[in-house]
Swiss-Prot record:
Binding-site residues, Zn(2+) 2: D65, H66, D210, H268
Basic and acidic residues: compositionally biased ranges: 153-164
Coiled-coil spans in chain: none
Entry EC no(s): 3.1.26.11
Family per similarity comment: Belongs to the RNase Z family.
Official protein name in the record: Ribonuclease Z
UniProt source species: Halorubrum lacusprofundi (strain ATCC 49239 / DSM 5036 / JCM 8891 / ACAM 34)
Cofactor(s) the record lists: Zn(2+)
Alphabetized GO MF terms: 3'-tRNA processing endoribonuclease activity; zinc ion binding
Cofactor annotation remark: Binds 2 Zn(2+) ions.
Length: 310
């Protein structure tokens, strides 16, 4: 069961030739989710092969580098004869401005757009096998991040034990794995907990968007399989990061380390590092012992299950 993250835009407020403004495409077993939609997002979708077929758009806040791609994307979806509704999730109090932005091309969209506010701590999307929740961030305007967390999976099935207990090979194996008792060949009843291990955790993906480091993010990102965190500046611009309510690479690394995240991806890289952003990653690595990534636009990460190596 796949969980793929494509980085469509990894840059800060000012685009560069190499980095577009914020946009992140997540494909979870065919469910296609877009997190933020900065200028140039639809071109990134074409260039990096994600396609336009998004089911939900999650907006972190209404700064231009996170939303100015919405009018063009909506127009293109209409040109492509989209018929399915599109749900846009946003922070409370931003619905009217987002509505105006959606209609900025001067006419009504060719398909239904639902704009739904979601407060930090609330579930934005309750889907089959996972949910997406909003969480509070600290920025210069009303903003929030999002966490995608999968349901627990059934434990590992012990086939040798099932055969030893007299369960015939076949459909009864699947019924046991799904939690249903079955009858063995000798007429005895075999319970699932006799042949199925404890539940195994699903995957957790966390996207902060623009934020200062905060304890709340550490809690939300606990044991995250992938944490995508604001890392706009290196240490040489720490005061600037504080003044603009962003994070440095080292601060992002510290959040990831305290959360026990497995992988950290650094995004929202300031244009001042267009020639060389390596100091941001180097400083993050000094604070974080896990895998630390500085994605380029177009990079794709496959998020494995927590027990993939077992």
């Amino acid at each position: 069961m796949s969980l793929r993250v494509t980085f469509l835009g990894t840059g800060g407020a000012v685009p560069t030739t190499e980095r577009a403004p914020s946009a992140l495409f997540v494909n979870r077993e065919g469910d296609r989710l877009l997190f933020d939609c900065g200028e140039g997002t639809q071109r990134g979708m074409m260039r990096f092969g994600t396609g336009f077929g998004i089911d939900h758009l999650f907006v972190s806040h209404l700064h231009g580098d996170h939303v100015l791609g919405i009018p063009g994307l909506v127009q293109t979806l209409g040109f492509n004869d989209r018929a399915e509704p599109l749900t846009i999730h946003c922070p409370p109090g931003t619905e009217d401005d987002l509505h105006d932005l959606v209609h900025a091309v001067g006419h009504d969209p060719a398909f239904q757009i639902r704009i739904e506010s979601v407060a930090p701590g609330e579930v934005a999307l309750d889907a089959d096998g996972y949910e997406v929740r909003a969480f509070e961030t600290v920025h210069r305007t009303k903003s929030q991040g999002y966490v995608l967390e999968e349901d627990d999976r059934p434990g590992r099935f012990d086939r040798p034990k099932a055969e030893e207990l007299g369960v015939p090979v076949g459909p009864k194996f699947g019924r046991l794995h799904e939690g249903e008792p079955v009858e063995a060949e000798d007429g005895s009843i075999v319970e699932p907990d006799q042949v199925v291990g404890p539940p195994r955790p699903g995957r957790k993906f966390v996207y902060t968007a623009d934020t200062r480091p905060r304890e709340g993010t550490v809690a939300v990102a606990e044991d995250a399989d992938l944490l995508v965190h604001d890392a706009t500046f290196a240490d040489d611009m720490e005061d600037r990061a504080r003044d603009t309510a962003h994070s440095t690479g080292r601060e992002a690394g510290s959040v990831a380390e305290r959360a026990g995240a497995k992988r950290l991806a650094l995004v929202h890289i300031s244009s001042r590092y267009a020639a060389d952003a390596s100091p941001i990653r180097r400083e993050a690595r000094e604070a974080f012992d896990g895998e630390c990534l500085l994605p380029d636009d177009g990079d794709l990460i496959e998020v494995p299950f927590p027990d993939a190596d077992e």
